[in-house]
Amino acid sequence: MAPLVDLRRFSLPIVPIRLGLGFVFLGGARALGVTAGGSARLFGLGAFLFALAMLTSRRRRLFWVRAREATPIDAAAPVATWAWTIARSTFPSTLAMTALTAIALASNPALAALLAGILAGMGIVGLVFAVELLLWERARAVRLLSVPGVKTELYVREAGGTTEAAPPAHAS
């Protein structure tokens, strides 16, 4: 079995990355001539529409139904490292949107401002999910895990279980 993905590790660190990329591209659109008002409206529209679509989606509601039915798993089950999990959380959505926004920035800065808003919206939705996840886990004293993939099995284990090998102790 592949190492499990700790969904807390998957959802929290990507938030500032997405928000940061969104604002960097917004700045790029501004630098390439999109007016302050126009870029703000396009950015806000992209963020709002993405957040609205994701926060009201059926898939989101079904995730929490699946989470309640997650399979208990042993605390010793291997969990992917922070670095691998963060890298995996950027693929494909963040990387694809970053590439599309960079291409748009070169050819249509106004479109880049809209896409930058979508990137920021991804960060906002990620933050909402991360907060919901933390509250859900805390209420149940568990950690929610999955295997990589689109529609994956969800697992729970008691909070405080070892997630990866401890670093070697330093000699004093």
Feature-to-residue mapping (PLM):
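Membrane-water interface of transmembrane alpha-helices
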Residues: 51-71, 134-138
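Alpha-helical membrane-embedded segments
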Residues: 49-50, 112-136
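Hydrophobic alpha-helical membrane-embedded segments
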Residues: 29-62, 127
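Alpha-helical transmembrane segments and their membrane-interface junctions
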Residues: 26-33, 37, 90-122
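Cytosolic juxtamembrane regulatory segments of multi-pass membrane proteins
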Residues: 77-89, 143-172
